[in-house]
């Protein structure tokens, strides 16, 4: 079971400190600034780490594949997956289809 704390980390040291404090899942933020190469760099000396990237993650095949191939455990998405206009219009069909599409890209990338 994962602990509730998920600190934002941007370096090997920060991930290490978070793990020493008992965190099982560390959030890499902002993902779009730090990039997938950072994840590979973090996992090289700490392959046991479970990393979740957030911030600028897009529900596109290219973006999700790059994060999964880099080695993230999971991704977090907000406004890119749940656009304000679609939520305001209660267009749950759009949101549902976008979620299914994103999950499909993730499943394919994990093969």
Regions found by a protein language model. Give the residues of each.
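C-terminal helical cap(s) of enzyme catalytic domains, especially alpha/beta-barrels
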Residues: 68, 84-111
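Alpha-helical structural signal in soluble globular domains
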Residues: 21, 41, 45-46, 70, ...
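Glycine/Thr-rich beta-alpha phosphate-binding loop at enzyme active sites
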Residues: 11, 17-38, 86
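Glycine-rich phosphate-binding active-site loops on the catalytic face of alpha/beta enzymes
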Residues: 28-35, 71-91
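Hydrophobic faces of well-ordered beta-strands that scaffold small-molecule active sites
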Residues: 5-8, 26-28, 50-55, 75-77
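Mobile acidic interaction elements
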Residues: 40, 45-48, 60, 64, ...
């Amino acid at each position: 079971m994962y602990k509730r704390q998920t600190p934002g980390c941007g370096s090997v040291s920060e991930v290490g400190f978070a793990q020493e404090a008992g965190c099982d899942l560390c959030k890499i933020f902002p993902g779009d600034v730090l990039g997938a190469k950072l994840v590979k760099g973090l996992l090289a000396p700490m392959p046991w780490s479970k990393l979740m990237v957030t911030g600028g993650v897009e529900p596109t095949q290219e973006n999700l594949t790059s994060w999964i191939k880099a080695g993230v455990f999971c991704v977090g998405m907000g406004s890119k997956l749940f656009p304000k206009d679609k939520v305001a219009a209660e267009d749950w069909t759009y949101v549902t289809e976008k979620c299914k599409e994103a999950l499909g890209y993730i499943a394919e990338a994990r093969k």
